[in-house]
């Protein structure tokens, strides 16, 4: 069983920084299919990871107040690239492909799973990863494996 540390209550400065992270303009920068395509590691990055169709893209749309900045779908495997969004305060929000079941050819799925693993375990500018869990299914072994990469 995973143990989770309880985070201290954020102070007012941290709360305001968190609010500003998502409150300003956010623009799509690029989608990448291999590590060579990543943008320069010149900004801090916050990524959203989780199983296929857990709501990563929808959450990005919700926190940025933009209905479709991140393309969401009811079809598992819709996000097949690592998508980078620039924030006004010089961060990247990163929408990752889902892991687990996807409606795509197996060789394509394997390629983006390798990309996901490489990104999570080796991106120097990655500062926060929000791992979304589907409450209907709970934490699966693959979720634990992803968390271990962090």
Where are the regions that the model predicts?
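Conserved C-terminal guanine-recognition region of P-loop GTPase G domains, centered on the G4
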Residues: 91, 110-150
């Amino acid at each position: 069983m995973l143990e989770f540390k309880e985070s201290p209550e954020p102070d007012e400065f941290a709360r305001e920084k968190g609010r500003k992270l998502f409150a300003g303009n956010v623009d799509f920068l690029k989608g990448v299919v291999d590590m060579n395509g990543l943008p320069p590691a010149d900004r801090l990055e916050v990524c959203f990871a989780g199983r296929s169709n857990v709501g990563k893209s929808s959450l990005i749309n919700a926190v940025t107040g933009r209905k479709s900045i991140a393309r969401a779908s009811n079809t598992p495997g819709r996000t097949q690239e690592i998508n980078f969004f620039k924030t006004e305060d010089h961060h990247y929000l990163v929408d990752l492909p889902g892991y687990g079941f996807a409606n795509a050819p197996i060789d394509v799925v394997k390629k983006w799973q390798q990309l996901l693993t490489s990104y999570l375990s080796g991106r120097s500018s990655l500062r926060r990863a929000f791992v979304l869990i589907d409450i209907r299914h709970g934490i699966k072994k693959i979720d634990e494996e992803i968390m271990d990469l962090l």
